[in-house]
């Protein structure tokens, strides 16, 4: 960036330096706040003006603007503290450490899962608060742990902490710094894993469990770090980035801790030693933190690089949260004290890892790419909302597609059109390593900043593709653009018109409109995804050109359910999301025209109706004898229902695509009676792997026949199981997706 376009870094560093000198209760803080606030306001105006004047430089300036906003936030917090009626620090009584730790104790554990090592030099009140947070926040149901407190030659009341029950207290004669303190604590540690935690931190309820589970469940991970937040709630670090020049960035510093980009699991360059967990054998192999970086700084970065050199991953876990004062023990001035080693050790680190930095790290202006250490290609998926796989089969398919992309080496960003964070579904994706966008985020702005970085964009459903395709074609210049139909809407509407005669004219008009829309979109993208071979054949017969791939629903056989045979099952079950109109029509047709005949033949058999979004009027219609109306159920409850039922019905009279509900029934060893619409695209054959009937009378006869014929029942489910494995596995979908992306 030329001088003409630049904003002086000196302005920001002056503001930051002044801010670092502020302390709560400082009698002169008001004057300092005024000066600092003035500097920041001036800087903020400069940055905003440069963004307006030079939009191409926006991505380089946004980070500085966020820092300014964060600094302003800290000023407000400090201002509130300095205007309180509390006495100045000098007049306050010294904290009573004995009172602070009253009632604090830790369990006695012979072979702990985790050793938590806390180095401390003076600031006994910090250490006491840290230990109290561990004692009060952590659940006894989590991993077992021991606490190793390293007194690094303290001269205050830190020694009083030694009285805490079952605390392992290591006392050094002198201050060995963070490196020496941690290493002396590690000698005493007995845990399978080791956590290093700063004494000026306080933990949260999920802090330990999420750190432990992340590393314990994935052998490819060597080190995991926490999300670090300032006491006022502002983000301090969401993983760290190291640039080619060895400068580091605490990603997200001074931004909002709940912003979407800081809340998904991802590989990072390093995690701050303020809160990390590492495998014990690795720490032993490395001989602890490297004494090259004695007394402190860059030792945690060096450790992360060594972990990665061993072929293991360094991962950021946002659900593990600590509140950290930062500099509470070491201070913040890089010209004096231990803090000066931040500059000295950077040079040592740069010299040791120069080749790695040059070959594998990005320049500072490319921090968007540098925030994710995986180096994977970037895929953007745009869909109406976050998938809810326990409510509809389309969501199951979407989650499976995301997993397939990840297995093919893509890092996935998921953009829900409604930009709504939906728990627990958003959280589940984030824990899979998916960046889920939510909040007041503008797609045009996002695309201008980052569109060039993406290799793939998948737009799901015609309405979504129509809304986003122009921006994507303009700004995602390096990406393959893919339209995922989910199903052919125009086909479904045409079939609905055949059933709903009263609305036929309107439905046919809608069908024609969707046909023009869908086929038009197919001509504007690089490839189209459909869910069945029948849809490929239809489109090709209608003259649609271009790449068309089949990525159907994904299913996995539940072998345990197949151990429950004919004699141990009873009742009939229907599953569907009733926001989908074909499902409403299906259950109404079944109740009015089919079930009465079934009930005559099988009076003791119940119909179990399962599914979300059941309208009140339909629910009233279903409140009849022999009908068990369950509505929405959890995955566990649904598994129990499907494992205990004898016959699954799918009386669909219109629709398109493939039917996830049928595939799910087969997963659980449940033979199916359906229509030709229901079996379409499912690779099922009448009398071989299912029973088909399109007339009400025939449908009822098929149910009663299958319900009573054990031999037929066993044959259908055996053949359906083989067909499902051949056509709907995750490996089949992944191969199809891989071929699509290579073409």
PLM regions and their residue ranges:
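Short hydrophobic beta-strand element within catalytic cores of glycosyltransferases
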Residues: 661-665, 671-675
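Short, flexible, basic/aromatic active-site loop/helix in glycosyltransferases
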Residues: 243-269, 284
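Conserved donor NDP-sugar-binding/catalytic core segment of glycosyltransferases
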Residues: 201-243
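A conserved acidic beta->alpha catalytic loop
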Residues: 133, 149-160, 174
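Acidic donor-binding loop of glycosyltransferase active sites
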Residues: 192, 454-455, 526, 643-657, ...
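Glycine-rich, basic loop-to-helix element that forms the pyrophosphate-binding segment
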Residues: 171-189, 199
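Non-catalytic membrane-proximal stalk/linker segments that position and tether the catalytic domains
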Residues: 5-112, 332-395, 401, 427-432
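Conserved catalytic-core segment of nucleotide-activated headgroup transferases in glycan assembly
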Residues: 390, 394-399, 403-404, 414, ...
